[in-house]
């Protein structure tokens, strides 16, 4: 007989749900992971793969710390997944750069990084603004139009698809139950007692985690939560494999383990339209060629668009229901970067039954000025 009662149900099998489900199952909670399937919007299958720190958390030091914490957790998570599943995530953390193609961009970037460092306070933020010959030593093949770059030691990249596969394999390997093609339709909520209907089955658990990406906007109110997320489109281009080695990723260009270059990615307000546009693709390619002129010799072999999961202020939303204790939600636009904290820090909080007080700034109550006051 199909099991119908669990310690926790996670709705959404993308990077966020899979990392949390993996963390919960590893903590010993019998966990069910429900995923809608290929017809859903799935950011986790179309992203760029950066494990990125240096552009995160301006004006939100709690997010800066959370992101950096995740970059620190990543090597542990990658090693553990490799050991448990045999799947390598391709993690490399050689540091990373943001390239500036004009003096104006360089000046603005310098101010941005200085402010980020001030806001980091005692936590600190190591970075350098690098110019000229030094920049060209660090990244051979830089184009003459590159004026300089910001560098931090924390940045890196990984394969998002291998990560997703490793999390799923690690989850089921630890005894978790994964149910694909199972869109949650009906549900009922009471404190520490939830039931959801998916694929003709009804499941119950004292904990439920909403990690359905853009689907959270509809699901959250049913569990006494808010997840006002909207789509933001990003387009990505991929070149053929090349033997030229890019020693570290930049904000918009990274080399996969297999040798392809990924070029990206745009930030567009296009609703739920998953189309691609030649103008945006041209801009992405032009900037890549100005950054590294040798890229012009490579053929493009693939291109796609995907939808980010964006909160109104661009920061993650982590929340717990006051009305229905035991219900949680997790939403973010950096699910690769944050996989480390989702599996190793957030999942243990959910397993313990409550988010730590330090997570309060991530609550969706920040959008509701009266209740936040
Ligand atoms: C172009 C682009 C580039 C990006 N680059 C990076 C990057 O370099 N680094 C980084 O860290 N992040 C990046 N991201 C962001 C990252 O991809 C997302 O943060 C992450 O994928 C979000 O994961 P998720 O699990 O919340 O959402 P999704 O991947 O969208 O998964 C949600 C899942 O929920 C399921 N679902 C929805 N509704 C229901 C329902 N009712 N019942 C059951 N299941 C449901 C869907 O089937 C889906 O699988 C990028 C995103 C885009 C679009």
Question: Where do the language-model regions lie?
Answer:
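C-terminal catalytic lobe of FAD-dependent flavoproteins
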Residues: 292-373
């Amino acid at each position: 007989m199909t099991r119908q009662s669990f310690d926790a149900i996670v709705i959404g099998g993308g990077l966020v749900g899979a990392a949390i489900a993996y963390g919960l199952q590893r903590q010993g909670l019998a966990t069910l992971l429900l995923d809608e399937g290929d017809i859903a919007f799935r950011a986790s299958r179309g992203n760029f793969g950066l494990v990125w720190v240096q552009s995160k958390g301006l004006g939100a030091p709690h997010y800066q710390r959370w992101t950096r914490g995740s970059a620190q957790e990543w090597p542990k998570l990658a090693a553990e997944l490799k050991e448990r599943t045999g799947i390598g995530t391709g993690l490399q953390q050689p540091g990373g750069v943001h390239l500036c193609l004009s003096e104006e961009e360089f000046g603005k970037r310098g101010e941005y990084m200085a402010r980020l460092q001030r806001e980091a306070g005692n936590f600190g933020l190591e970075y350098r603004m690098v110019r000229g010959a030094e920049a060209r030593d660090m990244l051979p093949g830089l184009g003459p139009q590159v004026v300089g770059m910001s560098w931090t030691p924390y940045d890196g990249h990984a394969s998002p698809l291998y990560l997703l596969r490793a999390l799923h394999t690690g989850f089921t390997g630890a005894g978790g139950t994964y149910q694909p093609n199972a869109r949650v339709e009906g549900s009922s909520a009471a404190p520490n007692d939830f039931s959801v209907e998916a694929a003709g089955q009804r499941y119950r658990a004292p904990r439920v985690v909403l990690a359905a990406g853009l689907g959270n906007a509809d699901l959250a109110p049913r569990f006494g939560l808010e997840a006002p997320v909207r789509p933001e489109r990003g387009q990505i281009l991929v070149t053929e494999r090349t033997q030229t080695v890019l020693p570290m990723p930049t904000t918009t260009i990274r080399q996969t383990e297999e040798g392809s270059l990924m070029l990206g990615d745009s930030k567009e307000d296009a609703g739920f339209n998953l189309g691609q546009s030649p103008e945006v693709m041209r801009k992405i390619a032009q900037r890549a060629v100005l950054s590294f002129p040798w890229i012009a010799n490579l053929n493009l072999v693939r291109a796609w668009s995907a939808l980010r999961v964006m909160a109104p202020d661009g920061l993650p939303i982590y929340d717990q229901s006051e009305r229905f204790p035991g219900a949680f939600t997790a939403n973010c636009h950096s699910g690769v970067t944050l996989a480390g904290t989702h599996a190793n820090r957030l999942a243990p909080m959910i397993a313990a039954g409550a988010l730590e007080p330090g997570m309060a700034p991530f609550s969706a109550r920040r959008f509701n000025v009266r209740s936040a006051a």
